[in-house]
Amino acid sequence: MTYLFRTLVLGTSALALASCGADEIVSPGTGGNITINNPPAPAPAPAPTPTPTSTLVTPAAGCPTISNPDQLVNDGTISGPTGEYRVCTMPARFTASSTLPFNRGILYRMNGRVDVGTDGGPAPDGSDGATDSNVNLTMEPGVRVYAAGSSFLMVNRGNRLTAVGTQARPIIFTSRDNVQGLNNDSSSGQWGGVVLAGRAPVTDCIAPGATPGSVNCERQVEGAAQPALFGGATPSDKSGDLAYVQIRYSGFVLSGDNELQALTTGGTGTGTTFDRVMSYNSSDDGVEFFGGRVNMTRLIVVGAEDDSIDTDTGVKANLQFVIAVQRPGVGDTIIEADSSNAFNNSTPRQNTQISNATFIANSGTRDQAIRIRGGTDYAIVNSVLVDRQGATPCLRIDNAETIQTTGDDELGVPRFNSFVLDCATDFRNGSGVTADQTQGIFNAGTNNNANFTNTLSMTFVNGANENGVAVFNPTALSSFFTNPTNIGAVYPGNNTWINGWTCNSATATFDSAVSACTSLPVYS
């Protein structure tokens, strides 16, 4: 009986041991009794960690109310890789000043041509019989606008666009395909673009017999099915303010061979301000300025399929801190400058002046990176031009009127100072101007170098060679300019302006860009 009892105890103990942890067992020794300690009550389970909040955007409940009589239309939602958004379609025309507020879950849509105000005519005082509607369309920082096909934004004379973003929240104009995540680094031409019209002087008038630069000299926006006129005699005219703005995938063909640029200005005046504007993958020009007065700082043009910067019809423009980078194998010129099409001595004569540019030619067209013609006056100072393909000549000048030294509203030959070229071929014969003549004009400037070896990094950031070039003081050209410490667009002490508000692509990468160009940024 004793033997049976011990057997039962041992068997029961083995089962208990199997259910206990090491710290719950007291060793029985070799001959003593076995003691089993009951485990302590388990600690309460911790509170569950909240499920992480998704970074994907969810749509706003509806569209905001605006001051315009015709309201935004709630057109449901649109989805893409960054989430789902409420689609708020703009009216075809803003007839009252209105604000498009930022909302993380809203995208504003243009369905066809969207007009800001009605055309107030070329005269600001009503002497032309037209009445200003004085509409100001304001977009808050972070607003994103998309469109498709022939849709474009038309800011008419006597009205304004106030699109002022911030470094962290730029204002973005883009395409439907971009929203839906369908684009790649070669996509382009998916909607029209942004057009600002003003009353500053232009040439090449559409009215026969009109005097260039006068209140009677007007021009029509290329490709617009309905009248979209610009021009007048008010150099200080104001068409709005643009800052921290991206314009992506523009250039849809409106009619025939007429395409819009990312940004088109027609007769805008000095009252219009531009700072930190980026054009990305326009199927036509990156920006084009038709007449007027344009003052712009910190312009970026990436991937334009025609000209990066096109200037025409008597514009007088000052640009400082400019980056233009072509996609490999794509694009025409970095700069195309004309004055008045076939009227080379019309006035006002174009005078465009650029300081602190970095131009990267990549098209391999074997044409030219910069073409100056049509009797225009032009100045490039404190700048760098590099041909990555080794096939495109740097500089071409056309027409005897472009290098003349006397004439109405004439500043003489093109001016180059502290301008360095890194091309396999520096100069090309033009129409009426030989490569040798162009070289002579270039060599007459100060601190120019046509045999430069670039040391750029990140595609456009100065290296030792660029920082070693003596600087030309551009305030001698215009009080608009500031006197820089170095040539080029990005250099020590001037290398943060590209941060935050830009977008990245295989063509050009910027520090702390707000997103890839193929994606929308997601804001908190």
Feature-to-residue mapping (PLM):
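Short, conserved catalytic or interaction motifs in soluble domains
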Residues: A22
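Extracellular beta-rich repeat passengers
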Residues: I25-N33, P50-N134, S150-G158, T174-D284, ...
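Bacterial N-terminal signal peptides that target proteins for export
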Residues: M1-V9
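Active-site-surrounding "flap" and adjacent substrate/cofactor-binding loops of secreted or lumenal enzymes
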Residues: R157-P170
